Amino acid sequence: MIIEVRAKNCYAFEDDITFSMKADMRNKKFGANVHKENNFNVLKTVGIYGPNNAGKTCLIKCIRAIRNVLLNKKNGLMPNIFTDSDVCELGVTFMASGRKFSYDFKYDAEKEEYIYESFSEIFKYKYNNEKEVCWLKKDTVSEIYECIDESVQTMISVVSKNNLLCYVVDTSKFEHINEMKQILVGFAEKIDIINMNNIPMQHTIELMKNKNQLQQKVVGFIKNADLYMDNFEYVDMDRIQLKTGEGVEKPDEKVLDIPENIMDQIRLVSTYKGVHVPSMMFDSTGTKKIAAIASYVIEALEQGRILVVDELDSSIHFKLTRAIVAMFNNELNTSAQMIFTVHDINLMDCKRMFRKEQIWFVHKDEDGVYVYSLADFTAQQGVRDTTDVMEKYRKGALGALPDPELINSLLSIKGGVKGDDANAK
């Protein structure tokens, strides 16, 4: 599970930002929303709010970059366009098998080199104090090289910088570096990242092809979403009923269209009053998105995965988004985690759904981009457990709110008045 993400000079983030999923155990409210293991307390869900183009998606890009780096894939990292530095800095603290680890790296995007990386294990002891034990530190700028495997330490300075250390040495020969690689790769492989505006149906299709318990749970999820649907199946073509002239058409939504697998899409059918119809052609965009996300949600809950969702509320009714989040917050969920961006303030509910530290904001102004939690606001600032957070956010008291002036556009279109002239009047 992710405990903390750190970034500097990455995408929209020029200065240091820290996104934390550490639970504040002074707050006893909604204890089921917290995963507790070996005296570590981690939030099961976090929702991120903010205006368009503020940096919410950039935060998800940082998580994706961390995952891709750890899996030896193209990282896609870009330094902030307003800085002179080419060095992107990223870090993550996470739990794996009941242990807490921290990993940080610096990547020179111009030279395509990893100029710094460090890996540590964090132990908790008396009075909740923590102790960090360094397994690896490679700082090519300051020429500091440390490794728990002494035989590795002598070679760190001469190995290539075009990749992480665990991918440029034969880790099978070194006990701790090999374990480090397994921990990092195992963590990264558990992260699924999806965008609800461009979510692939193929993941659900592949699960629907296999008649097993996981497939049955995906179908149950879709049916329980209250879509007036009798069943949802992957069937043979002869069971699909099409009216004359309809033929095999592509779905309207390009975001859900997979041309090379169009027949797979057609065989994914919904049943209404005993009639089988191709879901991709007949169902609403929202229904298709629910079907697409169903496989990710079920797999996350079944296998203890980390599901990161951009624009969770896209084309989905607010009651369904609440229900999906509630599945992860439930006490029956013992290992899965969900991080999501959202605009729907109906989810901003600290009275019935969330702890304060589960609601985060991304705010942008002329000076930069800021990432902060609702828990950063004190009672003296007017935010208490009994506060109507939705109303506070509507009024702009929490920041991270757009301030559109579209009336100027209307006046310029309909009245022949330019925006600046309209303001002057």
Where are the regions that the model predicts?
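Electropositive, glycine-dotted interaction segments
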Residues: 106-243
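C-terminal lobe/lid and adjacent interdomain/linker elements of RecA-like ASCE P-loop ATPase modules
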Residues: 1-4, 303, 323-425
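Conserved ABC ATPase signature
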Residues: 45-50, 249-298, 306, 312-316
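P-loop NTPase motor core
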Residues: 84-148, 362, 374-387, 391
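Conserved P-loop NTP-binding catalytic core
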Residues: 39-47, 51, 60-112
